[in-house]
Amino acid sequence: MSLTDILSPSDIAAALRDCQAPDSFSPKKFFQISGMSKKSSSQLKEIFRILDNDQSGFIEEDELKYFLQRFECGARVLTASETKTFLAAADHDGDGKIGAEEFQEMVQS
């Protein structure tokens, strides 16, 4: 399964256009524009599984910086500041990584 099986390609494109400039990425805004915030819990778990590149059950900081590239190969890498802000917003237990439940909570909040 791919992200375009769950999210509309046009919504993904719009979300990526919105954050093309460095330091313009807002996770909440990306989730809204891409349509992620309207998806069911099971769909969000599948999205998380796709984004968890190493299939560790977590999205670590190294994976997070390539977040946009998981949606489109040519997308930019998140800046260090964007990556740290994204991680801090989602990592509720402070373990330095985002679990599936933390991801789902962030998307749906």
Swiss-Prot record:
Tissue expression profile of the protein: Restricted to the thymic stroma.
GO-annotated molecular function: calcium ion binding
S-S pairs: none
Binding locations of Ca(2+) 2: 91, 93, 95, 97, 102
Domain EF-hand: 39-74, 78-109
CDD domains in UniProt: EFh_parvalbumin_beta
UniProt binding sites for Ca(2+) 1: 52, 54, 56, 63
Protein name in UniProt: Parvalbumin, thymic CPV3
Provenance organism: Gallus gallus (Chicken)
